[in-house]
Amino acid sequence: MDILTLGWVSILALFTWSIAMVVWGRNGF
């Protein structure tokens, strides 16, 4: 895996995690 692929994976993971936290926050509170 090269650095560009690793960068895209980390960005997508962070984006997915932030959306999941927003949805969980709305459902939790």
Swiss-Prot record:
UniProt cross-references to SUPFAM superfamilies, sorted A to Z: PetN subunit of the cytochrome b6f complex (SSF103451)
One GO MF term: electron transporter, transferring electrons within cytochrome b6/f complex of photosystem II activity
Signal peptide: none
Keywords, in A-Z order: Electron transport, Membrane, Photosynthesis, Thylakoid, Transmembrane, Transmembrane helix, Transport
Transmembrane segments: 3-23
Location in or out of the cell: Cellular thylakoid membrane
Gene Ontology terms describing biological process: cytochrome complex assembly; photosynthesis
Coiled-coil blocks: none
Membrane topology per record: Single-pass membrane protein
GO cellular component, one term: plasma membrane-derived thylakoid membrane
Cited function: Component of the cytochrome b6-f complex, which mediates electron transfer between photosystem II (PSII) and photosystem I (PSI), cyclic electron flow around PSI, and state transitions.
Self-association state and partner proteins as the record states: The 4 large subunits of the cytochrome b6-f complex are cytochrome b6, subunit IV (17 kDa polypeptide, PetD), cytochrome f and the Rieske protein, while the 4 small subunits are PetG, PetL, PetM and PetN. The complex functions as a dimer.
Annotated family: Belongs to the PetN family.
Annotated protein name in UniProt: Cytochrome b6-f complex subunit 8
Species of the source: Microcystis aeruginosa (strain NIES-843 / IAM M-2473)
Organism lineage: Bacteria, Bacillati, Cyanobacteriota, Cyanophyceae, Oscillatoriophycideae
